[in-house]
């Protein structure tokens, strides 16, 4: 029995080379991880995935990369702690759940980063801070100082005070990650996902192509995706494309 090597095209080789060059030369890197990546099938924080993420980010930091992690997961962690099956629709309840879950989320990260002697810091933001010039500069200065101290900031939306009706929310952390990238002048934004990539059509189609590279997010690209949310999270591929547009 012979095992055939998968066929690798010239374009795929070039894409890999470009990605490696960007990663190698990037000084500041923003990594965004969503709830679906951080949780298991039961909606609980997945300790193995958090451990893997902390390990990889710590390795980047050890290479003198300045790394910022934008992480969702507070609501999911709070729902698990309070034994809730569905994401609360009532705003006050949702914010209370997020407050409970944020502690569990940060404890999980802290535990894993400590195994690599890597210090992390919590930074909670709302859109209000980045809309106001003075607050914007304060946030920027704080993040830059943390990075200069070789600390990995863990950024999340402050769900306990962010109110969508008052436009103080980012809508999802994909947009927050893009804003933090611009705020810091980071050369690289990595958005982690629980799917293989961007499909040129339905992911359920047997012959649907995965797009290795997207040069520009236009109407054609956006037509491939749809808004998706579930009991634990908001976002989906559409919000990721909107964030980088």
Where are the regions that the model predicts?
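Nucleotide/pyrophosphate-binding catalytic subdomain
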Residues: 2, 11-245
